[in-house]
């Protein structure tokens, strides 16, 4: 009598799978929804989810080999350029007029980078589709919650003093996470589902308090359309536009202010901000080399070092705080990262370019340089795209007619 097959159950592997599922559920579902009602949700929940993912990988060892992955990172020019930005930020503590707040800001930056690297190394070599389908589910649920809050916001947020701020940050998170959600659904040929996600996110951003997220989503849509039409052109345009704006940022107020005066008048807030930027560049051209040091752009407005109406964009703050070294290193890192994303994942490339364009537009419009919630949001987007790329291993199932017949036994 044949012996019935026996299966070995490993409780440790089951526990690791459960921890990983909970981690991705928190990262892809709980966090986007909670970010619509709490401005601190991203900073609090993201590290918890990352710890769960790291614990799961430590148990089942399903991640890629650590040292080869670290070696690839350390030999990647764009990664080294990014580390140069971090190093220059640390070195700027020597000449910043606010060493205490700048040290805290640098610690937040380093902690976010370390968290992202640990989560990257902890991601499994092959992602399960069940975990990745949580992403569009969470983005759609968060968009629905945002729509409901914006429609009946007075009743739901009357006891929440940070309601509008949470909605603005939640809208930024939705604009950025919409693209990896669409990328996953398109890679699974769920085009209708991806269209539903885009419509829900666009509806939520239309009702959101600010226009930053909606504008950034529109910029991302243009990058998506261009890359979908012609892959190499879309990647090249996105990389050159982002890196080029970082490089020539000090010239922008001199070019944009006459146009702004002609369109909106000389006393428009945006025109006055450009005038303040012009004055900073003209009065201290030598400081464009080293920058004024970390945290100077924010604290400088409070203590009168900068005009109160100075721009709050990434382009201004990067040059003002880190100078030409930080700006050129950041531009090189961004250019290399965009090209690498377009080369390594052609299926995901249109949505990856859209995410790069969306994030860059958000930074240019007014998020700033290294705000902790913004850095954590960028970290989430990076990890999400890496996870989706590792979920593309499935081959197409062969048709029944293509399976060779077994020879008949005589």
Predicted regions and their residues:
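Long extracytoplasmic/lumenal interhelical loops at the membrane interface
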Residues: 264-322
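Alpha-helical transmembrane segments of multi-pass inner-membrane proteins
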Residues: 127-157, 164-229, 332, 336, ...
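Transmembrane alpha-helices of multi-pass inner-membrane enzymes
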Residues: 48-56, 353-362, 368-410
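Hydrophobic transmembrane alpha-helices and their immediate junctions
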Residues: 322-360
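N-terminal hydrophobic segments of proteins, predominantly signal-anchor/transmembrane helices
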Residues: 20-37, 49-105, 141-149, 248, ...
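Membrane-interface helix-loop-helix junctions at transmembrane boundaries of multi-pass membrane enzymes
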Residues: 10-16, 59-79, 184-196, 229-238, ...
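Aromatic-anchored transmembrane helix interface
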Residues: 77-85, 99-122, 133-141, 172
């Amino acid at each position: 009598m044949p012996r019935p097959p026996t299966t070995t159950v490993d409780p440790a592997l089951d526990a690791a799978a459960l921890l990983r599922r909970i981690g991705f559920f928190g990262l892809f579902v709980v966090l986007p929804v909670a970010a619509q009602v709490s401005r601190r949700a991203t900073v609090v929940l993201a590290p918890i989810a990352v710890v769960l993912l790291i614990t799961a990988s430590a148990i089942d060892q399903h991640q890629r080999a650590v040292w080869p992955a670290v070696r690839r990172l350390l030999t990647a020019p764009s990664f080294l350029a990014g580390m140069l930005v971090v190093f220059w930020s640390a070195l700027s503590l020597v000449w910043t007029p606010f060493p205490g707040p700048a040290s805290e800001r640098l610690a937040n930056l380093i902690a976010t980078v370390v968290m992202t690297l640990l989560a990257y190394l902890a991601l499994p070599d092959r992602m399960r589709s069940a975990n990745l389908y949580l992403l569009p589910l969470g983005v759609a649920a968060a968009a629905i919650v945002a729509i409901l809050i914006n429609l009946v916001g007075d009743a739901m947020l009357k006891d929440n003093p940070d309601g509008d701020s949470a909605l603005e940050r939640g809208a930024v998170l939705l604009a950025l996470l919409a693209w990896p959600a669409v990328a996953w659904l398109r890679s699974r040929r769920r085009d209708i589902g991806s269209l539903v996600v885009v419509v829900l996110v666009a509806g939520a951003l239309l009702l959101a308090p600010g226009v930053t997220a909606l504008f950034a989503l529109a910029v991302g849509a243009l990058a998506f359309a261009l890359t979908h039409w012609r892959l190499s052109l879309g990647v090249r345009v996105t990389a050159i536009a982002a890196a080029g704006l970082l490089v020539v940022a000090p010239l922008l107020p001199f070019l944009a202010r006459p146009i702004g005066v002609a369109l909106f008048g000389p006393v428009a807030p945006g025109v006055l901000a450009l005038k303040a930027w012009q004055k900073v560049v003209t009065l201290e051209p030598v400081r464009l080399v080293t920058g004024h040091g970390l945290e100077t752009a924010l604290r400088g407005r409070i203590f009168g070092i900068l005009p109160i109406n100075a721009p709050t964009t990434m382009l201004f703050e990067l040059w003002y705080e880190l100078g030409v070294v930080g700006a050129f290193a950041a531009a090189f890192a961004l250019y290399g990262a965009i090209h690498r994303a377009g080369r390594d994942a052609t299926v995901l490339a249109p949505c990856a370019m859209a995410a790069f364009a969306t994030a860059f537009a958000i930074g240019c419009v007014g998020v700033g340089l290294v705000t902790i919630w913004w850095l954590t949001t960028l970290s989430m987007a990076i990890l999400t795209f890496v996870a989706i790329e590792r979920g593309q291993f499935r081959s197409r199932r062969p048709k029944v007619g293509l399976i060779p017949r077994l020879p008949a036994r005589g």
